[in-house]
Amino acid sequence: KIYVKRDDLMGDGSVLPPWGKLFAIRNVLLSIKPTRPLIHLSVYGSWSGWALSELCKDLGYEFIMAYPKSQKYPEQMLEKVDKCIALKPNMMSILYNKVGSIAKEKDYVRLPYAFDHNAYIETQRQRLKDVKKQLEFDHLVVSSGSGVTCLGLLLEHEPWPSLFEPENKRTFHTVCVSNEETIKKK
């Protein structure tokens, strides 16, 4: 059997998706324990800004969602977040650096790009460990953007270097939905 992790099939715009990511993001927030407002770059196609907004409300943290202003960015997503900062659309690295400048200027805490934080990666690793107790499989297929979620899952799927030994049947597959170079860096 092949099981496929598909976050893109989760969430409907009115009910938060029951992601493993949501639990991992919550763990990042709890480990940061912010005393200043949090700011995060939420890009088109991502539920992260909305999810963070809801999590921050639950945890009593102030949250600001930065986003690239464009006709494609869904208005209904913006309506769900209390405080937004529209940015001029540009390359991802430029937008992320702009959010860093805003954070420094206004004394906000900038959340790590793609939640690249040990608490997030370890939560994903533990999640797969729990799944493996219930399901037996050799192939793991994961969609990947930044590669951060993949990293936690990959670390648990099979310890290195046995993943590359010929007799090993376990295989990790990724379907790249972003830039391959960002995944290779992870």
Language-model region placement:
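PLP-dependent amino-acid enzyme catalytic core
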Residues: 1-186
